[in-house]
Amino acid sequence: MTASRRFRRYLAMPLAFAAMLGFASAAELNPAAVVYKLPDQIPWGPLNAAGAQSAVVVGDPSKPGFYMVYNKWTKGNHFSRPHFHPNDRYIVVLQGTWWVGSGPKFDPQNGTVPMPAGSFVTHYGKQVHWDGAKDEDTILLIMGEGPATSTLAEEK
């Protein structure tokens, strides 16, 4: 095999591979079969007074029925006050470390347990808890049955 022929063969292989990758990334999904949002398309709401943002993924948490919500706690020792919900909630920690406390005594420094990314937590309905982030942003996926209200423990 001549040098020019080898050169063309070596040049053709990466070009063919690049073309295959280009075709693979150009695929389109049928919206009747699959609906998706990429991370930069998630509709995050405004930052609330406790230092958290939410984005509804599925359903409507204010109405009866199943819902899924992303919740992002910003770093800087931001915590909710002790509260409870009427229904069970199921939470997956997607990013960061989420700090969880239970009971009416609010003590973020000594009364919380760290839940690293990958943790699964159940908040039982009508049970007092509080939670937040300390030194890193934390993203949660919260699932439950609506309506998803929150009542401060002092109001119980």
Predicted ranges, named:
Residues 67-85, 124-126:
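Conserved short histidine dyad/triad with adjacent acidic residue
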Residues 33-35, 110, 128-156:
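Double-stranded beta-helix
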Residues 25-70, 155-156:
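A short, N-terminal "cap"/entry segment at the start of jelly-roll beta-barrel domains
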Residues 74-77, 84-106:
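Glycine- and acidic-residue-biased ligand/ion/polar-headgroup-sensing regions
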Residues 2-14:
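Bacterial N-terminal signal peptides that target proteins for export
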Residues 62, 104-126:
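Short acidic-glycine-tyrosine-enriched beta hairpin
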Residues 12-22:
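Bacterial N-terminal signal peptides
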Residues 80-82, 100-101, 123, 128-134:
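Short beta-strand His + acidic residue motifs that chelate non-heme Fe in jelly-roll/DSBH
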